[in-house]
Structures are given as C-alpha cells and as structure tokens.
Amino acid sequence: MNVIQNLLSAVSPQPDGDFVDKLNYCATTIGLVLASAFITGWSFVGSPIDCWFPAYYKGWWAEYALDYCYVQNTFFVPFSEDKAERSYNWEQLVADKQNTTSLKQTNQIGYYQWVPFILALQAMLFYFPVVIWRLFYGMAGQNVTSLCNTCTATEGNEESRKGTITTIAGYISQKRHRNLIVKQLSGFQNRANGSAVITSYLFMKALFLINVLFQFVLLKRMLGVDSYFWGAEVTSDLWSGNEWPETGNFPRVTMCEYEVRNLDNIHKHSVQCVLMINMFNEKIFVALWWWLCFLTVVTITNTIYWFWRASGTSVSKNFIRPYVEDIDPKVKNNRGKLQQFVSEFLSPDTVFILRLIELNNGKTPVVELIRDMWRRFNTAVPPPYSAPPLLVKDGAPLLKNFQDESEM
C-alpha cells in the first residue's frame, strides 16, 4: 500500500503545464495504476478463474488443472452456435483435433493473465512524456516548476513578494537581455533565440498525442479484436441487450484443454471454466476506450492550439500587449517600442513561462513580472529613433524626431 501511495504522490499535478497535460500524465496515470492494483489484488485475494471438473478430479489434480488453465490461454465457444450444441460432449470435441485447433485459434482468450501488467505499462507510457519534458527544461536551465511554485509563495509579505518577483523577472529574462546588450555593443547579429523550453514543451505535446493514439493499437492487439472501434461496438451490444454469450465480448465462460503424460501415453483433458475477472475487465477496458476517445480529441485540439501560440512574434505580442498597456498607457501611441520589447527583450521561452504562470497562478504575478521586465527594458535599451535632430535654430529643433512626437 505504501508503494502505491508513493507512486500516486509522484504523479501528482505540478504547475509546469496546462489542464490537458494533467489529464494525460496525472488523471489517466492514477486511474490506470488504481485499475492495475485492483485487478492484481483480485487475482490474489479473489478467484480470477474457476473450473468445472469431473468427479474423478481429486485434490492436487484439480489444483494443477486450475493453475494451468489460469496461466495458459483458454478459448471461447458460443453456446448459441450449432457446433457448440452438437459438441456439448467436450471429450468428443477435443478428439476432433483439426476442428479444435481451428476453434482455439479463432476464439482464443489470452489477455486476462496480463491485464495488470498491461495497465501498468499504459500508466508508464502516459507518464513518460512529462518526464522527458522536465528533463529537457532542467537541462535548459529553467526550472519551470520551481518558478511557478515561487510565484504561488509570493502571496504573503508585500516586501518579500516584491523581492521575489524582481528575482524571478531577472532570472527568466537574463539570457535574452544579455544577448541584446551584446548585439548593441558589438554589432553581432547572431544570438540565442531562447526557445529551448517551449520547443521541449511542444515535443511533450507531440509525445502525448502519439501515445494516446498508440493506446488504441495496444488495446486492439492485446484484446485480439478486429476493429479499433471495439469499445463502441461492445457498448452498442450492451445497450441492445446482447450479452457475452452471444457476442463473445469478454466471455465469462471459456474452455481450457491440457495434456497429462501417464507413462508412455498422453491423455487430453478439457474443462469448462468461469473467468470472473472478465466481469471487471469488461468495465475497465470499455471505460478506458471511451476515455481515450475523449483524451484524443482534447489532446489534438490542445496540441494544435499550443503550436499556434508558438507560431510567431505577433501571437506573443497579443499576449503581452494588454499587460504592458495597463502598466504604461503611453505605449499605445508607440507600437514600435512594444514590438521591440517583445521581439528583442523577451525570448520565446520568457513569454511561454509567463503563459504557464498565468495558467497556474493567475494574472497578478504576471502583471508584476512584466512590470519589472518593462522597467529593465526601458533602463537597458535606448528608445528607437533617438538620433539628434538634423536642423536646429536658436538651440531648438526645427523638426522633432519621431520619438518626441510619440510622447506628446
């Protein structure tokens, strides 16, 4: 139980992504872990399989057959088929080797032993993208989780909050700011574009999308179904009142056959078994299939949305502009200054981190961070078009420059 608690705490939501990220790596992972733990517990505590044995099966013989039928695959024979009715004498059915082999291959049930492991594997696949994302932004030198948590902690003392905001603002803008100063002093045109963090985030989004689509392939192969839309088909059958005896969907009653060597002779045996575990497997996997459908839609939409957000400076400017206009209303008459602030002073990573802070902490810390960075920008970067006037008479310029006109 402690292992499960530690695992669930490890996948708890962190403020380094949006709501869809948390649906993928947190909600889905926790649900799969709980389902895997439940099936595992039922396999040990309950009776995942029970078989009907003839009267001459005694003690260890019945135990051996029961264990064998659980670890080996069983096969389903619909009671509604004519062959099943003619073959109610199972010894006669087993004697017909060719028909039995074909029947086993067609209706083989081989997933119930592996359900806990498959669910655990699915949980790891859903958590893997966020591990890559956190590894990459750590390598880029921007601990996004710590930044967002620090913004949450600034809601206390006013003086302490201002100091923390100043530190965060300097931290997330220092790389682009230093590159901008180098450009102005030395004339170098090449500088780091500061997009490592957002590129890593988009890569995580792509991994989430690939993973959720791969889940349909994984379930199809594991359950041995013919269609990727099996979840809808099972739901339709249940809604229409067609239960597993007719459809074969997660059958509760299957056949198991095995061989026993007695001296030089090999005796074949066939028994009928009840897969109680399939009663739970049906509910779990049908619910999982519908959840994956929902997750696919929201993940595709969310991934497209974030790629659009990272598409260019104009999108970033539309995000920054309302904040800057509230801080400095004069910028409404000087769009060039705002453009320079967004395109040269703020890196794509800085704008992205501000978006995450807004998503996880609200607008208040974002306003304070942008106010501090706007102050740094005005201090470090000279105004555009600030050359001396060309014509002067009696110490006064005959033609005011563009910057002077914009400040009037």
Swiss-Prot record:
It is found in: Cell membrane; Cell junction, Gap junction. It is a multi-pass membrane protein. Glycans are attached at residue 99. The chain crosses the membrane at residues 29-49, 113-133, 197-217, 284-304. Disulfide bonds: none annotated. The keyword Aminoacyl-tRNA synthetase does not apply. Keywords: Cell junction, Cell membrane, Gap junction, Glycoprotein, Ion channel, Ion transport, Membrane, Transmembrane, Transmembrane helix, Transport. GO terms for cellular component: gap junction; plasma membrane. GO terms for molecular function: gap junction channel activity; gap junction hemi-channel activity. One of its GO terms (biological process) is positive regulation of nematode male tail tip morphogenesis. This is Innexin-12. It comes from Caenorhabditis elegans.
